[in-house]
Amino acid sequence: MTYSTESLAQSDIWPATADVSTLRRKLLDLLCQLAYKEGDFVLSSGQPSSYYINGKQVTLHPQGALAIGRILLSLLPSDTQAVAGLTLGADPIVTAVSVVSAYENRPIPALIIRKEAKGHGTKAYIEGPNLPEGAKVVVLEDVVTTGQSAMKAVDRLRAAGYVVDEVISLVDRQQGGAEFYQSVGLKFEAVFTIMDLQQRYQELGN
């Protein structure tokens, strides 16, 4: 399905007050319609794959961003002081959660973790508000395969003095990421597994 302003206007506009379970069902459909593709692909890890999930097709979609913000906010521990993620995939996710948190009177700032330090100015790896040392940060990700991408964000945040003990992803490809996080003492949660997407993809007749 190709996104257009016309298709958005004709679609079922999701009310901002919809309950999280409803948003979760609608987000799954959106991921199947816009992000999930079958074919021959090579992942960022170098692994070949018979399918690909282009998360930005949904994380940058207006209704998708709203659903993501509300769903992930509901999964955050009550003592979360910030959300963060590795650029570029996590940028719209942490932003959506932060914006929604302000509307729900639970303001949580967002941090963006660079893959390489800036070559000018502060030369920082981490962009966003300065937090106190020991602040609890949850790392967010769009798709987890091996778990290595989000781990880079975890390492940068810990090096800056923050406490990180949890990673939350929109989709778990179930290719070792969850086991990896467990092995390094990180809690891991995913909104959907790849089985959820593939089953719904078939139900939608794609």
Swiss-Prot record:
The keyword GTP-binding does not apply. The keyword Cell inner membrane does not apply. InterPro entries: OPRT, Or_phspho_trans_dom, PRibTrfase_dom, PRTase-like. GO terms for biological process: 'de novo' UMP biosynthetic process; pyrimidine nucleobase biosynthetic process. It catalyses: orotidine 5'-phosphate + diphosphate = orotate + 5-phospho-alpha-D-ribose 1-diphosphate. Disulfide bonds: none annotated. GO terms for molecular function: magnesium ion binding; orotate phosphoribosyltransferase activity. Orotate binds at T145, R173. Its EC number is 2.4.2.10. 5-phospho-alpha-D-ribose 1-diphosphate binds at R114, K115, K118, H120, E141, D142, V143, V144, T145, T146, G147, Q148, S149. Its cofactor is Mg(2+). Pathway: Pyrimidine metabolism; UMP biosynthesis via de novo pathway; UMP from orotate: step 1/2. It is an enzyme of class 2 (transferase). Keywords: Glycosyltransferase, Magnesium, Pyrimidine biosynthesis, Transferase. Catalyzes the transfer of a ribosyl phosphate group from 5-phosphoribose 1-diphosphate to orotate, leading to the formation of orotidine monophosphate (OMP). Belongs to the purine/pyrimidine phosphoribosyltransferase family. PyrE subfamily. PANTHER family: OROTATE PHOSPHORIBOSYLTRANSFERASE, URIDINE 5'-MONOPHOSPHATE SYNTHASE. Homodimer. HAMAP family: PyrE. This is Orotate phosphoribosyltransferase. It comes from Nostoc sp. (strain PCC 7120 / SAG 25.82 / UTEX 2576). The gene is pyrE.
